[in-house]
Amino acid sequence: MFECNDCLMQGFEQMNRQLTDAEALAGHLVPAGSMFAFLAAHRAELFPDAGYADLFAPPGVGRPSLPATRMAAVLTLQVLHDYSDRETAEAVRFDVRWKVAIGASLDDPGYDPSSLVYWRNRIARSERPHRISDAVSKVVRETGVLKGRRRRAVDSTILADAVATRTP
């Protein structure tokens, strides 16, 4: 019998666009080749739902989570911008570039900053705690977002607080 004190079944991104879809209405405002445009075009490949299934209870157990494709894109942008959880939640709510990158609608209210803590903790406890840092590295390679900067540290050091592994 399956028991879970922290049960969430996996939530999935709805691929059908809403009337107020940020990419459809304002995607032209996001510079081509930017990390935002890259995430908008490739987030489903970078963060496939199957790659996060290990974080959740079996289907039908618990309430649905926020979609992994969206939350992984948010955590990636948070690292690249060096934002706090509150700043990240505000960017998701108010910044059109972020809405386009994560696949949100323009009127999407976002979520509480504690959702980021929850996701980081789930990822940190998983068998693949570096999946976000791996994605950050790929975004940096593909977009050159750090091009021209002297320091190019994109390793687990910058994610120490974000995705620290715990010892049992």
Predicted regions: what they are:
Residues 64-126:
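Short, positively charged, Gly/Tyr-enriched micro-motifs
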Residues 23, 50, 56-60, 70, ...:
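Solvent-exposed, flexible loop/coil residues
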Residues 1-46:
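Charged, often Cys/His-bearing segments associated with DNA-binding zinc-finger transcription factors
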Residues 106-168:
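Active-site- or DNA-interface-adjacent structural scaffold in DNA-acting proteins
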Residues 30, 35-73, 80-81:
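Basic, short loop/linker segments at the boundary and entry of helix-turn-helix/winged-helix-like folds
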Residues 19, 52-54, 115-116:
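Short acidic (Asp/Glu) and glycine-rich catalytic loops that position anionic groups and cofactors
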